[in-house]
């Protein structure tokens, strides 16, 4: 094989001989073997210097540019690649069979054609079918053309013009400092009324709320360098507004005592007053009832004067506020027979009389204090077995015989018990128990 490459100033020339052309055929091999193929090009020295050399599989060498010379194989491939490149377009097909690119505007030629057809009096639905463009796109283009006189598409993406300029933020800060309770929509109206913004660039209510929250909200809390410029805060305790009851302080005229630590001044203007009441962030003793009762000594109001802060002293409280109903009411409730089974002795009542509050003592009409079974004198129902003591009367008919005497005795005993005042609630409970059964029961007061 013979390969020659000649380069000129403005032209290049490639010539070669195919030694293996005889394999294709004797006639073609002789014709191709005797002659030489020349390919010339007038591309200039730059193309000659950047000439690509391609070695074929048969051992031959080729030096052909992409756009040069008659190469059957390469030209055919290029001709086939052209339609394929045209077919590989990016887009989708709509319901009318037209091709569109999602997110991109319609070409200006189609836009102009839509406007021209509309000026000829063709309906938008007919334009949509003829140009294979969706009806919404046609209507939108025509509406914009009638409003602005332009067929150009709007801006894709981008951002709106900035409305929260430093001047607007400054005015919003001034409005908020002048009136801390102002609303965002009121600030928007004042921006329009003062001429700071017009109706096109006025910020929305949400934007004003965001400015108040992010930019101006941080300015409300002074920094460390601004603390010296501001006047000292008022000596108001933060928990006075949380708790509605009076807080004992050294400056209060009531004269209540308050524990002060040594070395701490007790002046009213000093902020670091020792807190004997739990603060707003305290978790321990959150109700503070015991602390408050120990400090004040009694409950506030007219009711508190009658009670002592200690529960042990409540046994001597007057029971005039708790009226007792007649004991005959106990005989009128036969439905509570199930509760009568549980007996309770008088000694247990006298034992607990020293530390129970006055309202916890049972009245004379309660049935839980009976120590004898009540089936004999309460209702003519089925007889109950004796629990601890023998029945007062025989079962069954005993109710009819002794019912009147029992009621009269109980009424007399109850009237006698209400005439005199017992010295203590424990004694009253014992007396009521004795008046019910008509038997003297000794009670020990401890």
Curated annotation (Swiss-Prot):
What is the annotated role of this protein in its UniProt record?
A: This protein is a transcriptional activator. It may play a role in the formation of segmented structures of the embryo. May play an important role in the normal development of the vertebral column.
**A GO molecular-function descriptor:** DNA-binding transcription factor activity
Q: Where is this region: Disordered?
A: 414-446
User: What PROSITE patterns does the record tag this protein with?
Assistant: PAIRED_1, PAIRED_2
Sorted alphabetically, the keyword list is:
Activator, Developmental protein, Disease variant, DNA-binding, Nucleus, Paired box, Transcription, Transcription regulation
Q: Could you give a single Gene Ontology term from the biological process aspect?
A: skeletal system development
- What subcellular compartments does it reside in? Nucleus
Q: Where is this region: PAI subdomain?
A: 92-148
Protein name, please? Paired box protein Pax-1
Question: Do the record's keywords include Nucleus?
Answer: yes
Q: What is the lineage of its organism?
A: Eukaryota, Metazoa, Chordata, Craniata, Vertebrata
User: Which organism does this record belong to?
Assistant: Mus musculus (Mouse)
Q: Which residues bind DNA?
A: 89-215
Keyword Transcription regulation in the entry? The reply is: yes
